[in-house]
């Protein structure tokens, strides 16, 4: 693979000269964004199918064989719908808000590695970049609520901003703990460090992943990610019985679709981050045949699908929490727990039983 890429680089540079770097960057962006959009589209089908199975029904099965064309039909429906801009809205901000939401969701994928050297930009501060860029999405939500000139949209935006900022703190402390045990902000190095240790030497690589010693942090990261996404059971932002669709209530057509795409792209992103930080990324769970025959990117996809399915399971199983319960969980439970575990890990790493170094 490295030789193939080197030959492609040489041929491209000989044909295009200094423009090759720009062309190659655009090719890599398209190679990441297009499959991501496909995954987002079919994640909606997977979600509806899984919830259908949990409810003992079939789910979508009419559009195409086994309902496989349902995401395409949904996309066409949204494309053909009229984009209605409310008469009393701040029109420029109303149009910009969905773009402000989806752009960080796509930009964060620039540093996500799909293999040891397979990343759009393999930067040393990848963990910090993801945390910083995803925190910008709250601005799109606030702008959407303000620009809509609707009390429902504004109330939903205020709820969303408070909830997202609150749970970002807990997620940030979890990332600090992962940084402590890994000694690196580079996502590829974090994965590689999980493939070494006593259990990995025995071939039981899955016992050397961070999920085992950092299990409470793994659970907090998944639950905080659910709240960060404003998904069920933390979806008071768009509680249908209270404020209809929250900050998205005045949006239609592709404007609404951008919020929708941002939510599902972020769900895949948080699942991928959980896989890279806690589940060994692209490493196989057991270092023996036939597990080692499976390519690393397939293992990465399987683990990410597992975490994504957890989000869907939460939606199908739990009732919606009240807003005060959500805030209490974030500030009085998760943030103190992450701080205490941060101290425990710091002390653990100074003892002879340090398992990370």
Curated annotation (Swiss-Prot):
Pfam families: NADHdh. It comes from the Bacteria. The chain crosses the membrane at residues 20-40, 92-112, 127-147, 165-185, 203-223, 259-279, 294-314, 329-349. GO terms for cellular component: plasma membrane. The keyword Transcription does not apply. GO terms for molecular function: NADH dehydrogenase activity; oxidoreductase activity, acting on NAD(P)H, quinone or similar compound as acceptor; quinone binding. It catalyses: a quinone + NADH + 5 H(+)(in) = a quinol + NAD(+) + 4 H(+)(out). InterPro entries: NADH_UbQ_OxRdtase_su1/FPO, NADH_UbQ_OxRdtase_su1_CS. Its EC number is 7.1.1.-. Keywords: Cell inner membrane, Cell membrane, Membrane, NAD, Quinone, Translocase, Transmembrane, Transmembrane helix, Ubiquinone. It is a multi-pass membrane protein. It is found in: Cell inner membrane. GO terms for biological process: aerobic respiration. PANTHER family: NADH DEHYDROGENASE SUBUNIT 1, NADH-UBIQUINONE OXIDOREDUCTASE CHAIN 1. Belongs to the complex I subunit 1 family. NDH-1 shuttles electrons from NADH, via FMN and iron-sulfur (Fe-S) centers, to quinones in the respiratory chain. The immediate electron acceptor for the enzyme in this species is believed to be ubiquinone. Couples the redox reaction to proton translocation (for every two electrons transferred, four hydrogen ions are translocated across the cytoplasmic membrane), and thus conserves the redox energy in a proton gradient. This subunit may bind ubiquinone. HAMAP family: NDH1_NuoH (MF_01350). NDH-1 is composed of 14 different subunits. Subunits NuoA, H, J, K, L, M, N constitute the membrane sector of the complex. This is NADH-quinone oxidoreductase subunit H. It comes from Herminiimonas arsenicoxydans. The gene is nuoH.
């Amino acid at each position: 693979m490295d030789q193939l890429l080197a030959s492609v680089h040489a041929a491209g540079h000989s044909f295009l000269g200094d423009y090759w770097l720009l062309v190659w960057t655009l090719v890599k962006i398209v190679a990441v964004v297009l499959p991501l959009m496909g995954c987002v589209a079919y994640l909606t089908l997977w979600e509806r199918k899984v919830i259908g199975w949990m409810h003992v029904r079939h789910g979508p099965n009419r559009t195409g064989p086994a309902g496989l064309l349902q995401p395409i039909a949904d996309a066409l429906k949204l494309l053909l719908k009229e984009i209605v801009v409310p008469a009393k809205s701040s029109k420029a901000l109303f149009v910009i808000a969905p773009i402000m939401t989806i752009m960080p969701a796509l930009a964060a994928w620039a540093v996500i590695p799909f293999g040891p050297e397979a990343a759009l930009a393999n930067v040393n501060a990848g963990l910090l970049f993801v945390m910083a860029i995803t925190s910008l999405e709250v601005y799109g939500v606030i702008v959407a609520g303000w620009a809509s000139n609707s009390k429902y949209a504004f109330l939903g935006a205020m709820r969303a901003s408070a909830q997202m900022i609150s749970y970002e703190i807990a997620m940030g402390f979890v990332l600090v703990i992962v940084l402590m045990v890994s000694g690196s902000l580079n996502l590829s190095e974090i994965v590689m460090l999980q493939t070494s240790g006593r259990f990995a030497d025995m071939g039981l690589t899955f016992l050397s992943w961070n999920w085992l010693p950092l299990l409470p942090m793994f659970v907090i990261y998944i639950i905080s990610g659910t709240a960060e996404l404003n998904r069920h059971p933390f979806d008071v932002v768009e509680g249908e019985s209270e404020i209809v669709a929250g900050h998205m209530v005045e949006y239609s057509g592709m404007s609404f679709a951008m919020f929708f795409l941002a939510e599902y792209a972020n769900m895949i992103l948080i699942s991928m981050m959980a896989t890279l930080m806690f589940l060994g990324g692209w490493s196989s769970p057991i270092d023996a045949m036939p597990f080692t025959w499976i390519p690393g990117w397939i293992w990465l996809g399987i683990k990410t699908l597992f975490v994504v399915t957890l989000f869907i399971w939460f939606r199908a199983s739990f009732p919606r929490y009240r807003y005060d319960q959500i805030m209490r969980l974030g500030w009085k439970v998760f943030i103190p727990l992450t701080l205490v575990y941060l101290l425990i890990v710091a002390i653990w790493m100074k003892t002879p039983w340090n398992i990370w170094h």
